[in-house]
């Protein structure tokens, strides 16, 4: 008798955030339930969904938004929800760890078990995205998590612009890549629109590694008061799911709330990945230059 292929249905959520934690967590739960109704097994919520994207401004008071990982109320609530519905939920949050702070995601398995933590590795610093003020560079390294439905890799927002991160997770056996995100307009340049670039970069990761990829981004205009006036970002959504050759399988627009779903045959994709040869023909002995900042070759 032929073995059944492993089918997994993934989902990306997209919604506008208020600056009220309870409202945002309730919205996330409502959309998780909607995704479950559509058959989703692994459901991605956007980055730092508990409130506004506070990193627009450097304000000491915003450190009060951070909470310790263990016993975090939103993680506990999502554990209960995951167990009730039998779904996997990566949960993004602002983590306080003694005197360190991280942009983190906890991976909740379908029985409510917390599988562990990933801390954002690449921390941006620019107008409107002043994350270095709040977050230490992550110390977990890129990881994969064996969930009930698939082995997954999860990284966060700015990580998605680095092909090394996607490849590191794929090399560890990630069968699907997930990127919770908060990205939109550039306060210093009204003419800069990165949405298409943003999507294409990750479609490239999917195609280069022959794995599906899920990206969840917020929508809506958020205004943060600063000492120099207001900072404003309009988040452009554009959440999407890409297939293992980089093709767009499901995509949202820039204004509407969305629940995107797509199903993948993991065994079929595994065969394609092995047959394509990109892992067979790798030359790690020639890649040492990737371990340098200036491109110098350390091999004499």
UniProtKB/Swiss-Prot annotation:
Enzyme Commission (EC) number: 3.5.1.53
Keyword Protein biosynthesis included in the entry's annotation: no
InterPro entries with a match to the protein in the record: Aliph_Amidase/BUP, C-N_Hydrolase, C-N_Hydrolase_sf, N-carbamoylputrescine_amidase
Keywords (A to Z) from UniProt: Hydrolase, Polyamine biosynthesis
Catalytic activity: N-carbamoylputrescine + H2O + 2 H(+) = putrescine + NH4(+) + CO2
Gene Ontology process terms (BP): putrescine biosynthetic process from arginine
Residue ranges constituting the CN hydrolase domain according to the UniProt record: 8-266
An example molecular function term from Gene Ontology annotations: N-carbamoylputrescine amidase activity
Subunit structure: Homooctamer.
Family per record: Belongs to the carbon-nitrogen hydrolase superfamily.
Protein name: N-carbamoylputrescine amidase
Naturally occurring in which organism (per UniProt): Solanum tuberosum
């Amino acid at each position: 008798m032929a073995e059944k292929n492993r089918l997994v249905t993934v989902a990306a959520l997209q919604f506008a955030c208020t600056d009220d934690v309870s409202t945002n967590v309730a919205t996330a739960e409502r959309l998780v339930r909607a995704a479950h109704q559509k058959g989703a097994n692994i459901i991605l919520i956007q980055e730092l969904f508990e409130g506004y994207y506070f990193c627009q401004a450097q304000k000491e008071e915003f450190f009060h938004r951070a909470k310790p990982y263990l016993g975090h109320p939103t993680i506990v609530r999502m554990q209960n929800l995951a167990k009730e519905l039998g779904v996997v939920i990566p949960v993004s949050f602002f983590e306080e760890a003694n005197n360190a702070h991280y942009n983190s995601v906890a991976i909740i398995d379908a029985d409510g078990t917390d599988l562990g933590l990933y801390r954002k590795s690449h921390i941006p610093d620019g107008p409107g995205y002043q994350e270095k003020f709040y977050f230490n560079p992550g110390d977990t390294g890129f990881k994969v998590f064996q969930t009930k439905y698939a082995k997954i890799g999860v990284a966060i927002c700015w990580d998605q612009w680095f092909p090394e991160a996607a490849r590191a997770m794929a090399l560890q056996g990630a069968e699907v890549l997930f990127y919770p995100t908060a990205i939109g307009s550039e306060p210093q340049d009204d003419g800069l629109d990165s949405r298409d670039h943003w999507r294409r970069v990750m479609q490239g990761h999917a195609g280069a590694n022959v794995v599906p990829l899920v990206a969840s981004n917020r929508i809506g205009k958020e205004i943060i008061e600063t000492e120099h006036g207001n900072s404003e970002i309009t988040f452009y959504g554009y959440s999407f799911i890409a297939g293992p050759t980089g093709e767009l399988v499901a995509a949202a627009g820039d204004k509407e709330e969305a629940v995107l779903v797509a199903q993948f045959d993991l065994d079929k994709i595994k065969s394609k990945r092995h047959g394509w040869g990109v892992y067979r023909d790798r030359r790690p002995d020639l890649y040492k230059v990737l371990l340098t900042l200036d491109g110098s070759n350390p091999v004499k």
